[in-house]
Amino acid sequence: MSWYDDRPWMDRYEERVRRVGDIPARTALDMFESAVVTAGDGPAVRYLGGTLGYREVDQLTDGIAAYLLENGFQRGDRLAIYLQNIPQFVLALIGTWKAGGVVVPLNPMYRDELAHILTDAGVTAIVCSESAWADRVGSRASEAGVRIALTSSELDIQTSNDERLFRTVTRARSENVPDLLEVARVRAGATMPDPGLTPEDIALVSYTSGTSGVPKGATNTHRNLTVNSAILRLYEDKPAGAPIFALAPLFHITGMVCQLLTAIDLASPLILVYRFEPGVVLDALERERPIFMVGPSTAYMALMAHPDFSGERFASLEAVMSGGAPLPPAIVERFRELTGKYIRNGYGLTETSAPCVVVPPDLEAPVDPASGTLAIGLPLPSAVVRII
């Protein structure tokens, strides 16, 4: 047996984290259904003054799944979600899985790449904002052969009408495209057939950023997603029901696994603020008191540079993580100086369903003296990592 096969870094983990073999094989839908039983009417999503409970999300997603099936959506079909961090993203995701489908989460800033991805992924249905449909999605979806379209507005559910976010946002309903929430509410609580999903079925086709060419779709199975979210839950050892802040975009695999699915695994509320606006994020942190968040280093830099920044706004956070971009040691030290919180680094890929290497909760990452680079951590128990 080689040194690598011995995996000596596992000794740095607590026993609860090493027991990856005890994580049950399940689908993301199984995980959500367990959360509904655990949380009941407790909050699933909080969005700028608006709240959806777990039981309500369960009923609304039954309605979305029923609509999809009524319109010819079949098991294994792909539905693209082209939305910012709003509750309708969560509804579309779970509704698609209830219909037996595969979700294709898309960066809502994509324009030129959109037609390629819709065609390459074989997308049958799409959910997007009203303005995006009118501006760019409608024509590209038609060209790609998308048969089912639903739109939604970022103004729905929230009550803040915060001008920092919504000053230029207006309603732009398209006459022939149904509204996601209306469809869901009309059919809420519909009796749904078992979609027959297994842990080895594909849950997501997640497109890479295209740094080496055109974006390419990586397949993430239900087991990939549920194991990584469960590992993160064990790793962080956070209580059920504790709020998770969505700093990273949900369309990104980090936001999907480390925020959305981890919140579901904990039967916790996911805190959404539409898009990253530093002042809005700072206000939400103080108001919602989350225990965990993860985001790129650029987000932490922007927060610290904002005139309303104060360490007290971060007081509730028990874990702060960074991924998706290099994390300069100076940012880690400055953030700790201002907030008392240490940003733990992590590394993952779209293809690995987010984290595969993370700095453990009780350790700090060393800095390479030659390059000044911060270490990314240790392999998770669920990952096999080789440097070649």
Feature locations, PLM:
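AMP-dependent adenylate-forming
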Residues: 4-11, 29-53
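Conserved AMP-binding/adenylate-forming core of the ANL superfamily
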Residues: 24, 41-86, 90-94, 111-115, ...
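Conserved AMP-binding A3 loop
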Residues: 53-55, 194, 203-227
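Structural core segment of the AMP-binding/adenylate-forming
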Residues: 70-71, 102-183
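Short beta-strand->loop structural element characteristic of the AMP-binding/adenylate-forming
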Residues: 80-82, 89, 93, 97-135, ...
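Conserved pre-ATP/AMP-binding loop-to-beta segment of ANL
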Residues: 170-207, 214, 237-243
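Conserved AMP-binding/adenylation subdomain of ANL enzymes
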Residues: 226-243, 251-292, 306
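Gly/Ser/Thr-rich phosphate-binding loop
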Residues: 290-294, 304-370, 384
